[in-house]
């Protein structure tokens, strides 16, 4: 369905939760090194429950390698500096969603590289005075919107593809 790219994730439970999200939505999770934890970390396994076998997880030595692996679809960077809401984007299968780490976000060099690859920068709106949304929550919000726009393709529940799309937001 979609590619989720995490740039240097630091907190095992966030990544574990996203493994579970990928299993439930048909997405592929791409982890860009260095990681702030070992892939066998107990907290990662606990958060991902038994979904690890159901979700494709790829590791990449660099952002360049990750972008090469997902070439072909559109690239979206989801960061607090975005000028357009994720809800205004029109997602298609094969698109890639790039997120920064929990404490540092996406470094400027990575943002420059993503822009050079044609990335569009999106933001998740939030109240003034707040810095960011939890990484696992942010990814979930965007992935479910992207999946909704595509009729929840592959969902087990019959009839979900007939759910009308929300009107375009100006």
For each feature predicted by the language model, list its residue ranges.
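Post-transcriptional modification and biogenesis factors for structured RNAs
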Residues: 1-170
């Amino acid at each position: 369905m979609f590619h989720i790219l995490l740039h240097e994730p630091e907190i095992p439970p966030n990544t574990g939760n996203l493994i579970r999200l990928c299993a439930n939505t048909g997405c592929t999770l791409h982890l860009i090194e260095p990681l702030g934890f070992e892939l066998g970390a107990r907290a990662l396994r606990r958060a991902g429950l038994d979904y690890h076998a159901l979700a494709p997880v790829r590791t990449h030595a660099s952002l360049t390698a990750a972008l090469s692996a997902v070439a072909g679809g559109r690239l979206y960077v989801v960061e607090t500096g975005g000028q357009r809401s994720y809800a205004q984007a029109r997602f298609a299968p094969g698109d890639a969603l790039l997120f920064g780490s929990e404490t540092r976000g996406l470094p400027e060099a990575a943002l420059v590289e993503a822009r050079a690859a044609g990335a569009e920068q999106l933001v998740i709106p939030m109240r003034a005075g707040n810095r960011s949304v939890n990484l696992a929550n942010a990814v979930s919000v965007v992935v479910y919107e992207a999946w909704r726009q595509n009729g929840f393709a592959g969902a087990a529940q019959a009839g979900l593809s007939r759910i009308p799309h929300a009107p375009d937001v100006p």
